[in-house]
């Protein structure tokens, strides 16, 4: 296993979590696979260990904690606000190296003060990392899904393109492809005639049935990645969007925005100046951005030491605002020790009867061990 449950890092994290006013929750190793297949990103879906029970239900080894912690909260019909801590194994397939890792984190559900709970999440994550690696050189990088969404709206992009760009936010290669599609610069391979007709008619259910049949004929499980229904929806959406083009001047502004990378203490001023110069209405999202920055400073974290990167996000539908990472030079996976963010849509997507906002983070213990020189 990558990371040891008897290491100094493990023990320091356990002690720190115990002091963060969060209930340590036990989550079963075997989980229903569908929530992860439906909501997780493309990279995680490919790495899930899948199996079936005797009834044919898709199951998996726990690939992460956020989704099952939220499902557990819904199942218990627990009151909010509620904070959950976790520390345990996650399982992800890799071509080489370990497939079992230790993760720790906190999920903060139902807090009414968004700015304060965002700041607390960063402070909690930083405290956990610092407890294990007090002398490490760290970098905090922060992004904001809502500022990016506000930028797309201010530019007047159609809803379909906004959704497509939001799904690519944080994935540089995917974003580049979508921007190329917007300018008409990308050539698209023609669809097989049998599929093209259904796409042209917008027959999503018929297209999904045909895709599922072709997958089964080819020996591909329809639950191994994107579902036939999701593929059908995206094919039809892509065809609709192909007819839409956007002014080059607006795309240039979007690219300029995505190149913004400044310290958090100057980020709001930089963004307001950009909005004013180009007559963009970002007032509402920047008001929330400034409130969070103030809350972060009030939590004792120097905003001059945090980088705001306008292109940093996560290509997952349920992230709605803050996203962040704590990084260290020389550590694998681009130095990422911890990652977190706000996911106000997730619990509703998982079946909650009311809107429950959430923010949380996960820490990779094996990377922390590497940083402090512990043997795995």
UniProtKB/Swiss-Prot annotation:
Pathway: Amino-acid biosynthesis; L-histidine biosynthesis; L-histidine from 5-phospho-alpha-D-ribose 1-diphosphate: step 1/9. It comes from Brucella anthropi (strain ATCC 49188 / DSM 6882 / CCUG 24695 / JCM 21032 / LMG 3331 / NBRC 15819 / NCTC 12168 / Alc 37) (Ochrobactrum anthropi). This function is generally fulfilled by the C-terminal part of HisG, which is missing in some bacteria such as this one. GO terms for cellular component: cytoplasm. InterPro entries: aa-tRNA-synth_II/BPL/LPL (IPR045864), HisRS-like_core (IPR041715), HisRS/HisZ (IPR004516), HisZ (IPR004517). It comes from the Bacteria. Heteromultimer composed of HisG and HisZ subunits. It is found in: Cytoplasm. This is ATP phosphoribosyltransferase regulatory subunit. Signal peptide: none annotated. Keywords: Amino-acid biosynthesis, Cytoplasm, Histidine biosynthesis. Pfam families: tRNA-synt_His. One of its GO terms (biological process) is L-histidine biosynthetic process.
